Regions:
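Structural marker of alpha-solenoid helical repeat scaffolds
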Residues: 60, 93-95, 128-129, 162-163, ...
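Register position in tetratricopeptide repeats
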Residues: 43, 77, 111, 145, ...
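Canonical positions in the second alpha-helix
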Residues: 57, 90-91, 124-125, 158-159, ...
Length: 281
């Protein structure tokens, strides 16, 4: 489902809805307003309010597919899987080409630990959808549940090809490489990614960690430097750079980097411990 960005009108709708709940008056909202209100409540974990909005929304707009899908989504969240499945089957009869029906169906299969069936269902959704990034991500997660790391990696790569700023997908790709102990392959992949995204601090940070695992400390150091150039308040890069400098016996420089992390955020026990170890050496 597509949702409009929250703006003044959305905030007014939310205020209007919450004011209505405090009175006995029932006000009219168009279906898009209900969708944004429900989306807001679900995003903020306010399930009871979301359910009230869904109930009233369907009373005012009984044929709204998106509101029906929200109702199903809440049933799945509450593990009312049989009821959700029954409602989905009824919706499928009306809209057999709606990819959201397949996504929610896959969600049910996943909750039932039937991950292979979830993948097959998500692949059907792929055939119907123009927006594929989130679907590839969902498929990747199902493969992770099955410990099929090569397949998961491939799915997350497709996700990143569709949206090259999806850092969650990038982290998942590296997780798969790490589990498969494919450090060199990970470096090759990250280098290709960096060619198109030269100022991506996440990629530089990850490539530095790969070099660190291979004990190529000089290349790791260069990578963390580039991560810091890309984002000079990236605490993780300073911590990793400090670890590399320790390996190179450059303890004073390591201390400097650990101290930077203390200035950027609340002190971590790791940074304080490493500073103490460096002073000992």
């Amino acid at each position: 489902m597509e949702f409009s960005q929250y703006d003044d009108n959305n905030n007014l709708s939310l205020t209007k809805f919450e004011s209505m709940l405090k009175t006995n008056n029932v006000l009219f909202f168009d279906s898009n307003e209900f969708e944004n209100i429900i989306h807001h409540y679900l995003d903020n974990g306010k399930i009871a309010l979301a359910k009230k909005a869904i109930k009233l929304g369907l009373e005012q707009h009984p044929t709204s597919t998106n509101l029906k899908l929200f109702r199903i989504e809440v049933h799945v969240f509450e593990n009312k899987l049989d009821l959700a499945d029954e409602l989905l089957n009824a919706l499928y009869e009306i809209e057999p080409s709606n990819e959201e029906v397949f996504i929610q169906k896959a969600n049910i299969f996943s909750k039932q630990d039937n991950h292979e069936k979830a993948i097959q269902t998500l692949q059907k959704a792929l055939e119907l959808s123009e927006e594929t990034s989130d679907l590839y991500s969902l498929i990747g997660m199902e493969y992770l549940f099955l410990d099929k790391f090569e397949e998961a990696k491939s799915s997350f790569m497709k996700c990143l090809e569709t949206d090259n700023e999806d850092y969650s997908a990038l982290y998942n790709i590296i997780y798969c490489f790490d589990f498969l102990e494919q450090n060199k392959e990970a470096i090759d992949y990250l280098n290709t990614y960096i060619d198109s995204n030269p100022y991506c601090q996440v990629a530089w940070h990850q490539i530095g960690k790969q070099y660190f695992s291979l004990k190529d400390y000089n290349k790791a150091l260069t990578s963390f430097d580039f991560a810091i150039i890309s984002d000079e308040v990236f605490i993780g890069a300073y911590l990793e750079k400090g670890k590399v400098l320790e390996k190179l016996s450059r303890y004073e420089e390591a201390i400097e980097n650990y101290k930077i992390t203390l200035a950027l955020d609340d002190p971590t026990s790791f940074a304080l411990l490493r500073i103490g170890k460096c002073y000992e050496k």
